[in-house]
Every structure is written in C-alpha cells, then in structure tokens.
C-alpha cells in the first residue's frame, strides 16, 4: 500500500502581502530579516522583488508571498498592478523621517482607490525603532493616524529584529480572517439564491 503523500505546497493556504512605503524606510530590510534572519543595510532599489516562505500560523502550515515594492516616484505608475494582487499591506515609514510618515497617507489613499475597500487588511509600521535618539515621529502621532484609519500601529527594527515576525504574522491573521468572512458571505448568498430558486419551483408546481 502506497504511503500518504505529504501535503503539497499548492494545497497550503497562500497569503499575499505587499510592502509599501517611501524609499529608504527599510521595507527590504524588514522583508529580508523575516525571510532569512539577515540584516541588509545597503540594498539596491528595484521595481519589485517577490519572496515566498512556508510558515506555521497558529498551528497551521501556510505560505506567505511577499512583494517588496520600490518607494521611488519613478515606479508610482506601476504600483496599481501590484496593489490589485495584494491581500494585505504593510505600510512602512521610518520613525527618523517625518517625510516618510507623511507619505503613508498617499500610499493608503492609492491602496483604497485600487482595492475599493476601506477594510482591506493593513498595518501601519514605524521602522528603525533602534534609532530612538533620531526619532522625528512620536508614537502618539503614529497611533493617532492608525486610529483614524482603524488599523493597528507597530514599531519595528529590521536591525535588532524587534517585532519583525509580529507584523507579518499579525497581517496574515487579518488576511485569513478576511478570507473567512468573504467565504461566509459568499456561501450565504449561494444559500439565499438556492432557497429563492426552491421557492420559485414550489410556486410553479402549485
């Protein structure tokens, strides 16, 4: 008798995460720290880099697909295509750079415009928390913005790995919850459709 085949990667739940934020805030450093446990300080910006990894989320083996987008304005026009494919977003700024914090509003607006959904899974991330002495964006200021958007705010350090796993896992939980919600809604619509069809059929018989 043939042994049971191990669960294939294709059958694992896949959660698609998009990294957004200005250039130089540490999006790639966060991604590479999460993927490979490495801190990369100097990273050449590209249009986008994609990464995939198997992880255990609350006891369930899943896959995370991370698309690390470039923050430079040159690439603004092609971001829409990336945003359409995403299921959740980590919007990153540097706590040492007020300008990058201000830019998060533009990224949020662009995401909402493309996704047409105010409740899209989304986390506001203040990176470079190890550089407290150079802080320009207060925790209170960032938390206030997160509250306005009805999202969570987390501070990270790609250098020390502080909260790196947390932001990716928290976002995956949001994505998973959203998928379950959408699935219930879809099933509810199917049931209502089926019930309406049965009622119509009964009326025809009568």
Swiss-Prot record:
- A Pfam family of this chain: Ras
The entry's stated outcome for residue 72 to L is: Impaired cytokinesis, as shown by increased number of binucleate cells. Impaired cytokinesis. No effect on cytokinesis
Q: Name the reported effect of residue 49 to E.
A: No effect on cytokinesis
Outcome after substituting residue 81 to R: Strongly reduces interaction with EXOC8
Q: Name one GO cellular component term.
A: Schaffer collateral - CA1 synapse
Proregion positions: 204-206
Q: For binding GTP, which residues are annotated in this chain's numbering?
A: 24-29, 40-46, 127-130
Going by the UniProt record, its keywords in alphabetical order are: Cell cycle, Cell division, Cell membrane, Disease variant, Exocytosis, Glycoprotein, GTP-binding, Hydrolase, Intellectual disability, Lipoprotein, Membrane, Methylation, Mitochondrion, Nucleotide-binding, Phosphoprotein, Prenylation
Q: Which SUPFAM superfamilies match?
A: P-loop containing nucleoside triphosphate hydrolases (SSF52540)
Fetch the PANTHER family from UniProt: RAS, DI-RAS, AND RHEB FAMILY MEMBERS OF SMALL GTPASE SUPERFAMILY (PTHR24070)
Q: Which disease is it linked to?
A: Hiatt-Neu-Cooper neurodevelopmental syndrome: An autosomal dominant neurodevelopmental disorder characterized by global developmental delay, delayed walking or inability to walk, impaired intellectual development, poor or absent speech, axial hypotonia, and facial dysmorphism. Additional variable features may include seizures, autistic or behavioral abnormalities, and brain abnormalities.
Q: Quaternary structure?
A: Interacts (via effector domain) with RALBP1; during mitosis, recruits RALBP1 to the mitochondrion where it promotes DNM1L phosphorylation and mitochondrial fission. Interacts with EXOC2/Sec5 and EXOC8/Exo84; binding to EXOC2 and EXOC8 is mutually exclusive. Interacts with Clostridium exoenzyme C3. Interacts with RALGPS1. Interacts with LPAR1 and LPAR2. Interacts with GRK2 in response to LPAR1 activation. RALA and GRK2 binding to LPAR1 is mutually exclusive. Interacts with CDC42.
What is this protein's name? Answer: Ras-related protein Ral-A
Q: Per the UniProt entry, what species is this protein from, by scientific name?
A: Homo sapiens (Human)
Gene name on record? RALA
